[in-house]
Amino acid sequence: MAPEQREGKSQVSVTFEDVAVLFTRDEWKKLVPSQRSLYREVMLENYSNLASLGFPFTKPKMISVLQQGEEPWKSEKESHGCSPLGCHGSLQTTKSTQTKESLFQELKRKQLKRDEAWDFTSGKSCRPDNSFRTQDTNESLEIISINHTKILTIDKSRKNFKFGPSVGLKSIGKQKIAGEKTQRNSLEENSTLLSQPKLKTVEKRYKCSTCEKAFIHNSSLRKHLKNHTGERLFQCKDCLKAFSQSSALIQHQRTHTGEKPYICKECGKAFSHSASLCKHLRTHTLEKSYTCKECGKSFSRRSGLFLHQKIHARENPHKYNPGRKASTSLSGCQRIHSRKKTYLCNECGNTFKSSSSLRYHQRIHTGEKPFKCSECGRAFSQSASLIQHERIHTGEKPYRCSECGKGFTSISRLNRHRIIHTGEKFYNCNECGKALSSHSTLIIHERIHTGEKPCKCKVCGKAFRQSSALIQHQRMHTGERPYKCNECGKTFRCNSSLSNHQRTHTGEKPYRCQECGMSFGQSAALIQHRRIHTGEKPFKCNTCGKSFRQSSSLIAHQRIHTGEKPYECSACGKLFSQRSSLTNHYRIHIEEDALNIDLHE
């Protein structure tokens, strides 16, 4: 052996403990068999490689145990923190299991190699004075360093080394050892440890007694409980809107200031919420698997493709009819694999991307409604629905139409209202060809042709085409009138009736016909009026085939075939099939009463 090699080895004393990774009995129990096998393989190879360098040290007891195929802690008794290596000095450590497990993931990659030069100092510049030189000075060698942060002291016979919790065999990189060489600091490599997957799952110990949602931290549970109690301590000074969390208030204030602190590094687009930025970043990283058949443009989300297709619908409305589903270039099976949904509902088989979405959905089957209104006692399955409902009592309408100034309690209602001004209609009924502005409206409209009425009243058995009509009907049985006019105090069963009534005080007529300029106080009146210009008569009698512009006209006409006469005169008891006929009949009694008064006088 060359003198410079012997001199190099005399400068630094290396023992097996320097490169061994130790586990306590409890930590060893948490390793799965594949991890234990990998640990055994790496430790034996490290010992073999270290022994081949010719350093003088005794064979550790743990190596003998591993070579016999036994587990380190199988026959050992844990006593005062001793490791399976045997108590070669005092070992004190506060290193968490999670750190060791993170280290374990890179143990295989960072095992020792034969004929490698070593430096166990603190990461400073290494000047070996021509030591560690092999016969071929041009040979590339890989310098290995042990890097540490927190204190873990191992007392040795020759030296005291101070290490830390991120104990790891750090591969610094291949360098040419010739003359004067330096060692790079391995701190820059620590990010590889942090990026390793965590083996240990964190227990969610804090559980909500109302909805059973679990949280890791008690503070998160306290914030969540405010959704049930309705507590709102943080108020906006601009619009007086209150929030249960300070973070929600900060985000809300950005709607007033226009601040957008979250900027995309890819395209420079700015966002007011971090969640919006995260959602936007997917457009740069996700595979664009939804392709428009018209122009070939691709999108990462089906909703993006659907909105894009509306552009083609405006250009060629007769050719394009999106129908109920947006078309994509992928088959149904491929779409399932490209966007996995791992949470399955056992009741109906629907799948969801998150456990919270599954919990919300399951309340449909269980009927659970944990969020209750403190004003009227009405309960909801989601906190967002409760917040929107509370605006009925407070009168708050934060979403305002820029065209006519009308306010709404939710953004979805505002979007539906805007269609009145734009006239956009992208959904065509296959039966009558009627164009509708939303998919949900198309589904409800189609029930007119099919006669389907899935929403049934449990009290009287009456059925309705939509759930909102059922809710309004049920208030007839309960007597509930939650909508009150602030001008005259009159109450109503539905919000639309209140809105229509309030226009009698203001004289407002926001619905304007683009054909003749005539204005109306109600959207239904405008819709009926438009049929005069278009000649549309969508309501057809199944008995005689006669068509009508209004559903009320069809109902009145059908009484001719059925013979039903629901309107009775309170004076003489005569029956009529239409209200207008009863009104005309009343005039006979009024004229008779006036004649009798004149005769008596």
Swiss-Prot record:
A zinc finger (C2H2-type) spans 206-228, 234-256, 262-284, 290-312, 343-365, 371-393, 399-421, 427-449, 455-477, 483-505, 511-533, 539-561, 567-589. Residues 14-85 form the KRAB domain. The keyword Magnesium does not apply. Keywords: DNA-binding, Isopeptide bond, Metal-binding, Nucleus, Repeat, Transcription, Transcription regulation, Ubl conjugation, Zinc, Zinc-finger. The keyword Ubl conjugation applies. It is found in: Nucleus. Transcriptional repressor that binds DNA upon activation by RAS proteins signal transduction to initiate transcriptional silencing through the recruitment of additional DNA-binding proteins, multisubunit complexes and chromatin-modifying activities to establish a platform for DNMT1 recruitment. Belongs to the krueppel C2H2-type zinc-finger protein family. This is Zinc finger protein 354B. It comes from Mus musculus (Mouse). The gene is Znf354b.
